[in-house]
From Swiss-Prot:
It holds the Pfam family HypA. GO terms for biological process: protein maturation; protein modification process. It comes from Roseiflexus sp. (strain RS-1). Keywords: Metal-binding, Nickel, Zinc. The lineage of its organism: Bacteria, Bacillati, Chloroflexota, Chloroflexia, Chloroflexales. InterPro entries: HypA/HybF (IPR000688). It comes from the Bacteria. This is Hydrogenase maturation factor HypA. Belongs to the HypA/HybF family. Zn(2+) binds at residues 73, 76, 90, 93. Involved in the maturation of [NiFe] hydrogenases. Required for nickel insertion into the metal center of the hydrogenase. Coiled coil: none annotated. HAMAP family: HypA_HybF.
Length: 123
């Protein structure tokens, strides 16, 4: 289950970013996950809960945006979404497509956090 190691890396990256920003607690982690990433969503959610235990991300929600598979069709000279990831053929002209544009990413997009500074709680 490589999702657990991905979750550990995600927590480590988010911890570093939160520490740099002086954040005490992260509440939401936004992740972009491509169709072809090979990551099982439910396993990643479970792994995130395990990996975040005892960190400033403990109890944080992992929001996953699924990124569809898009390829570049040289014949049509355009980017097209593939409805079936098993066939890398342009749905418009039927030509084989070799260049993937989106759909492979595992990207930490944003963090949401609680601001515990006295200035933030006073207003």
């Amino acid at each position: 289950m490589h999702e657990l190691s991905i979750a550990h890396s995600l927590v480590e990256i988010a911890e570093e970013a939160a520490a740099k920003a002086g954040v005490a607690r992260v509440t939401v982690v936004h992740l972009r996950l491509g169709t072809l990433s090979g990551v099982v969503r439910d396993a990643l959610l479970f792994g995130f809960d395990v990996a975040s235990a005892g960190t400033r991300l403990e109890g944080a929600r992992l929001e996953i945006e699924e990124v569809p598979l898009q390829v570049y069709c040289e014949t049509c000279d355009t980017v097209v979404a593939l409805p079936d990831v098993r066939y890398f053929r342009c749905p418009q002209c039927g030509a084989a497509c070799r260049r993937i544009v989106t759909g492979q990413e595992i990207e930490l997009a944003a963090l949401e956090y609680e601001d515990d500074t006295p200035e933030a709680t006073a207003s």
